Amino acid sequence: MPSQSGMNPADLSGLSGKELARARRAALSKQGKAAVSNKTASVNRSTKQAASSINTNQVRSSVNEVPTDYQMADQLCSTIDHADFGTESNRVRDLCRQRREALSTIGKKAAKTTGKPSGRVRPQQSVVHNDAMIENAGDTNQSSSTSLNNELSEICSIADDMPERFGSQAKTVRDICRARRQALSERGTRAVPPKPQSQGGPGRNGYQIDGYLDTALHGRDAAKRHREMLCQYGRGTAPSCKPTGRVKNSVQSGNAAPKKVETGHTLSGGSVTGTQVDRKSHVTGNEPGTCRAVTGTEYVGTEQFTSFCNTSPKPNATKVNVTTTARGRPVSGTEVSRTEKVTGNESGVCRNVTGTEYMSNEAHFSLCGTAAKPSQADKVMFGATARTHQVVSGSDEFRPSSVTGNESGAKRTITGSQYADEGLARLTINGAPAKVARTHTFAGSDVTGTEIGRSTRVTGDESGSCRSISGTEYLSNEQFQSFCDTKPQRSPFKVGQDRTNKGQSVTGNLVDRSELVTGNEPGSCSRVTGSQYGQSKICGGGVGKVRSMRTLRGTSVSGQQLDHAPKMSGDERGGCMPVTGNEYYGREHFEPFCTSTPEPEAQSTEQSLTCEGQIISGTSVDASDLVTGNEIGEQQLISGDAYVGAQQTGCLPTSPRFNQTGNVQSMGFKNTNQPEQNFAPGEVMPTDFSIQTPARSAQNRITGNDIAPSGRITGPGMLATGLITGTPEFRHAARELVGSPQPMAMAMANRNKAAQAPVVQPEVVATQEKPELVCAPRSDQMDRVSGEGKERCHITGDDWSVNKHITGTAGQWASGRNPSMRGNARVVETSAFANRNVPKPEKPGSKITGSSGNDTQGSLITYSGGARG
């Protein structure tokens, strides 16, 4: 039986190639081809399953391929010189060292993508491994991958915060970190290399990997399949293949010594080369004093302060400074100019120094505010010859500007050795005038010839030098700019130049309109038939037939314009005077030509509103500023029809005899259709006696608290409206001047009866004022006075001692003050005392239990917890 002969496919899964061949030959020798057919069928089925699984893995691998951290580390380690990374070169070296350790442990698959291989996978031979060795290898690979990922994350964080620490490779590091973050954001943790598989897996399982044993492959395909499986699962415990060809000897970057000669920079910006003694990140123990400034020779570069400190100290003063002289030549050495830290050398700082210039131009400008001027002529001049442009240096053979009389022959050609340079402009600065000058006209044209304009060396030609000349222009535009500081008006062109509508040029005498010519406005904007002789530049401008203006009162006037025009002369007289009668010109006439605008005339018909809001129109009969003599009674109220509007009276309150005590009357209106007008406040009508008698003067001396403005009494006496209380109401009360107090009804009746009789004014009796008041002796009646001021001759209060006359309700004058008038009978008011005999309802029991502070005898109505009822 095939099952008994050992040809079961399940038993062949763990055999090698030689063992399979030996088993096949043994089966053929015992059973013949029957055993081969069963084996072939089972092998074909396993081959198809392996092919299908390989195709699926190939599709999946093309989707899940993502760059790993090892590939990103390859880009950083590809730089030959790690010193280009600046102060973080040691960190990059550590990253490259970890990458090489991972490659030496895992192999080249650490640098590949995380996806599965895209080919058919063939299992390796079964090799027996030690389980402990496999687990240790897996842990080592996992730790190396984690450390590489952490190191790359730290480098990216430094590149984001301080990219200058990577030196010239800062942009490369940031680009790599940006690609890493993009991969993590798109693919998540798949962008991070997973835990590498154990190298002993295929050897432990042998040929049990699905698809590894493929008998259908022969020769080249089988070798390719074998290499793919070695690439995927490794060689197990077998040693790796040695490289073929020439091997380049390379020094490990981790063991490489630092450079002997490095370049640094001082705080002043100078470059320093040699062995660097700055602080390094991999050296500990030198942290104290890292950020302190060093006096003397600077052996600590600015890179140390940039890497480890947040601030940079100020550089020391330079020993050798480079300054410039007044002529711009550099001078180096110890600076001896004035400084702000030294006092006492202010005298003579801004004076010119003769001899050698040791004061720099920069110091002169900073201390004096102006640039230094050269004190003497240059001893050595530099120039170039006119023909061959060779440099000529030495004493200047040209005439200086302070020497006159050597103008003759200054511009002639020199034979022999040429000692003059090509700077001909220096010869004519203060020398003789040129024979042929070049000037410009007002229109901008060039004029050459003998200059006949005004000169600074010629006097007597000042008259008329700035006037315009008609005819040929022989005065240059430069003369007006230098002597007159004005720009003359350009004369019209004799030959004009214009363009047609199609862009063709037209020259000759222009027949276009001009601003100086009037009367040719009609037809200026019309089209021209026939030959086009020009294009109108000024279109329109004529006077309109109908124009709209506004009169002084604001009324609109339209029609033909009759006011002053700029193109019309002779009508200036009386142009700013007002016109009586119908206004045929408005405000637009006065504003551009007159200094002021006249006031409009009075309106014949006026419209206003009464205090009740009624409209009144007609002739104005109120007071006016232009009319005098009607001031009397202008503020008095008018009975009957109201023919005076609210604009004149301001809606004043009515007479006091129509007012009732305690009632507030509000009179007035606001017109929303017309603009608001401000009116002067009128005089307040008198509400008291117009003749001040001694009796009235005595009453005015009475002072006290003013409670009259409100006109109402509040509080417990709220039903006492109309009662007279206090001093202010006594002062203005309607009562008899003489006699005893009367009831209110009787007093009002007597007042109405005596209103028709003439009032007899009492005689004024002159009284002598005592020089000083003398306190009266104490009496028994004075003891009835209580409160402030009961002491004799000592009055206390807010403001009782403002004068010599003591008034009020204190002292010996309290019992003899004016008696108050008796008012109407008061209504008996009910107080809380009357509720004592009223039966009270029984209090219900408390319905709240468990509350804090509850009481059965508490209040029935409360606002917090524990209320009863």
UniProtKB/Swiss-Prot annotation:
Statement on biotechnological application from the UniProt entry: Expression of 10 genes for alpha-carboxysome (Cb) proteins (cbbL-cbbS-csoS2-csoS3-csoS4A-csoS4B-csoS1C-csoS1A-csoS1B-csoS1D) in E.coli generates compartments that resemble Cb, contain RuBisCO and have its catalytic activity, showing it is possible to make artificial, functional Cb using these 10 genes. Cargo proteins can be targeted to these organelles. Artificial Cb assembly in E.coli requires csoS2-csoS4A-csoS4B-csoS1C-csoS1A-csoS1B-csoS1D (but not the gene for carbonic anhydrase, csoS3).
Disulfide bonds: none
Region (C-terminal domain): 604-838
C-repeat repeats: 604-651, 690-730, 773-813
Keywords carried by this UniProt record: Bacterial microcompartment, Carbon dioxide fixation, Carboxysome, Repeat
N-terminal domain, as annotated region: 1-259
Region (Disordered): 1-65, 182-206, 241-289, 556-576, 831-869
UniProt-recorded name of the protein: Carboxysome assembly protein CsoS2B
Native organism: Halothiobacillus neapolitanus (strain ATCC 23641 / c2)
Chain's gene name: csoS2
